[in-house]
Amino acid sequence: MLIYVPLEHIEGRYTVHMDRDIEAYLNAQDIEYVKVMPTTETPPLPEGQFLNAAFTSKFKAMQIAEISAMFESGKINDGDTIFFSDIWFPGIESIAYMKYFTKKDVKITGIIHAGSFTDTDFVRDMERWAKNFEDIIFDISDTIYCASNFIKEDIIRKRMVDPNKLVVTGLPVDYSGLDYHKGQTKENIVIFNGRLCDEKQPWLFDELEKQVNEKTNGNLNAKFIKTQEENLSKGEYYSLLGKSKAIVSYALQENFGFGVAEAVYLGCKPVLPNRLVYPELYPNTKLFDRFEESVDMVIEALLSTAEFPSQVVSDPNHVFNLWFSRPTTTPKKMYRPDIEEMQ
């Protein structure tokens, strides 16, 4: 049996569609599972933040309580797998604790989205204690699914982990929800859909707007929109992407990027830096090395009357097959390059 531990639902983020699509896949494949979802009601996010740290901690504690009750009542048995939609999960060590005392052969698997092992991630300031927590995660887990080789290599460089546990699968983009918005007439709209935080450098988008207008004397009448500043429904957001000509990122941290993946599927020209995950996911796309290049790329996109070809970054069914059909691995040793090299 699969014990499925989803993320809390946050409207406007990938958590809602991922939960829906995972359940649809499990039902279609006739996979026996129990979903640990204490509530689908989520309070509004604090202004400027993409999660509510207090609520997500409470939500995860409720999930641990439900899983503990399943261990206590004997509903979890040898051969079962516990799958976390985000394995960076405070309290996950209690699963290993219960496994030890019940002597149940239960696999722990899940997706690693980010962590303090990335120097430019917003949680980097927690590394003093978070690195110990992350080492626990990598120790007690059987298989950890990575969105990209970029994050996998980051983990191997910075944490104690058996590399064989880390499996690159990509993430499931909600293409079915995007199809309705394809084929719209393109307008001179440039989009920045990253979070408004230091690691995404939104102020460079302001400078981009200034320099594009200066170089074209404002003759392109372009709109530069930060979607996080707009109060858009999911449908309105997708419609805006469908009408836009370019999607821009100045990210200093990105392990996958749902927002860019959605935009390029809807025919936006990607204007992306030549770093992080972007060379891996967009190998046939011109990427910029200097800010000035991004200005020229946006002007080129705005002047073009041809629609940029739609791109598919990942196949959701392939991702789900890897998550739920692949046998989990049992690690043989821990590995950390800096220690190995000293021996």
Model regions: which residues?
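Membrane-proximal helix-turn-helix segments that form the acceptor-binding/catalytic region
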Residues: R124-I144
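Short hydrophobic beta-strand element within catalytic cores of glycosyltransferases
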Residues: K269-L272
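N-terminal pre-catalytic "stem/leader" segment of glycosyltransferase-like enzymes
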Residues: M1-G91
